[in-house]
């Protein structure tokens, strides 16, 4: 089969000294300043507390992280790439390339957790489960449909709902364990992921709002109706996914409140009003406390915890330097 390839006749080099939208540089600096890798987080310190979880709790944790891996895989391989097609400037495209890479880092992070804490058969079972779970596959299909739609604004709506809403049924569990002094180093890494996703959702939501500015009132209302309808469709599925995961440990209602809270956050990123009333968004205070970037950090030599780290600088020494 012959595939016609349009020749590239004109390419514009990205010039960071001439910024068309200052938000691009602001977010670029934030994302690069936040750069991290899972290999720097001491996950092995969580092996003792992992052993205190029941078999059912371990299975739940592995499945939750596998579900998150699937969403990160979509964002890395499809979502960010589709958004780059609509980038208004080379700087926006560069920021989205960073977003894509960090989604790959996030997916890699869950594999680091698995290889450190879990047995290979248990992990393989979870990956099979992710391919067969109807609710996980359904939300993936809904998001993928919008990424393939060709509508730049609808793609951004889908991306913000994934980044700022769908991830959080999974993020709840490591925060829950952390609030009980379990898997604290794993929670530190999840907080690094949450920090990234917060910037991603904010930035893509900002670009969405900039796109809306160029539309007439009728088209704006059409997009708003679409956003709320898509959120409700995803929420209905996410509630069922949450029930299937968390009913066995009695956490379903708490997780749903967390979902309501973050659904409203996603709408805020899009510039819309909240959908769920305050009463439905009363998240367990222990979970909100665990979400804080400094929740478990004491940076002592015994804990090893910390949701940030510093890459050390090597300094050359000689034997005489060690004569005290």
Protein language model regions, located:
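Non-heme di-metal
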Residues: 1-324
